[in-house]
Amino acid sequence: MSSRCLSLLLCATACFGAGGRVLRVCADPNNMPFSNRAQQGFENQLANLIAKDLGMTVQYYWFPQRSSFFRKTLNAGHCDIVMGLPSGMDDAATSVPYYRSSYVFVSRRDRRLNIKSMDDPRLHHLRIGVHTIGDGDGSLPPVNALISRGIVHNLVGFNIYGRLDEKNPPADLIRAVENNKVDIAIAWGPMAGYFAKHSSVPLQVTPVDVVSPDPKIPFTFAISMGVRRGDSQLLQRLNSEIQQHRPRIHRLLESYGVPLLAAPPSAAAIAIPERSQLLRNCCKRGTDL
């Protein structure tokens, strides 16, 4: 074990062990409805619930969720837990899932589009808003699925990261629907559901019903909490907390407008190829969700 690894281990023991009562959480300071510096996100609320149950207090390490998020936060020893990441992703040891959600269509109710499928022929002609990411990170599931169907020229891209000084950059996509800049958007459900719920314009949010010819394009994700690999004690505590408070957690998520899906019939059903990179981007994770 290197001196650096040893120092990180000692730090984690001091902060979480018997002598410390602080639960260190890494989070994005500007990523509603997940988290923000004012601690208004549902991941903030969930962290408080768990910390209170364990007789601890939450201490945040704030860092914008970009592609380097896990390397510069959790795996650099700045915290013990990240609240929302895809189950089984490579960057951390993940808990049992505490919710499952999907991408959704978002449109104005007065348009009465009622689109549910990526194979709806109207998608070839409507202005479709989608989130985009920087070069070198690949594309998000909606973009890949649309391109595979020959739907390209009517796509309107909105950078999911935005500017650091911009409030809630991913919400620009939903605002474009409100303002008729696009006819319909395809977005990650928890983000879209929250901003649609708080919109001054009545919006319709519909989970994407995809029968994709390419199984490598997932549209649903199981979401877990993450700890550093090897931290089995904390992981076991989180699993216990999730199981104990699952109904309460789901009520919290529903209050934020998060579209919830039933759990898959088996763990294998959520073992989706490449999901860690996809969700990392879709939820500013990374999600990333």
Where are these regions (language model features)?
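Extended ligand-binding regions for polar small-molecule ligands
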Residues: G41-D53, R109-L113, D119-D137, P213-L260
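Extracytoplasmic small-molecule ligand-binding "clamshell" domains
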Residues: G19-D91, R163-K167, Y256
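Bacterial N-terminal signal peptides that target proteins for export
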Residues: M1-L6
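A conserved helix-loop-strand patch within extracytoplasmic ligand-binding domains
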Residues: M56, S87-D90, P97-G150
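Periplasmic-binding protein-like
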Residues: D28-N31, R100-V104, R111-N114, G157-I160, ...
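Hydrophobic residues within well-ordered alpha-helices
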Residues: I50, T73-N75, P121, A176-E178, ...
